[in-house]
Structure formats: structure tokens, C-alpha cells
Amino acid sequence: MDQLLYRPKEAAKVLNMSRDKLYDLIRAGRITSVKDGRARFITADAMIAYVRQLEAEAAEAA
């Protein structure tokens, strides 16, 4: 990931999910987002943290 900020559509593509699913995760507090004016962005760090959280949950379930 070379970019620091991703628009929701871009972040959803990187995470291989729909934009609606991404917004559900943002509302649930599982992925953080930032706003610059009216524009919403997801940071690269937030996406990495989400993937690490998924890995930790999978390890606990195993």
C-alpha cells in the first residue's frame, strides 16, 4: 500500500468487499475512517488493523 488515504470505493476494492459492507464495518467501529471536509477516507493503517483483527479472531476460533 503506497497510498495513505483511500476513498471508500477504493478501500472496499483493496479489502475485496462491497462499499456497503465497508460502511457497515465503519458504523460498527471495526474500521476507522477520517473526514476532510465532506470527504470520507479510510487510512492504510486502518485497513491493516482490520485485517490483523480478522487474523486474531481466526486464531482464537481455531
Where are these regions (language model features)?
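Short linear sequence elements within intrinsically disordered, low-complexity coil regions
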Residues: 11, 27-28, 46, 55
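Major-groove DNA-recognition helix of helix-turn-helix-type DNA-binding domains
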Residues: 14-41
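A short, Lys/Arg-enriched interface patch at domain edges and termini
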Residues: 45-62
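Polyanion-binding surface elements
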Residues: 1-20, 52-53
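Short amphipathic alpha-helical segments
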Residues: 8, 41-42
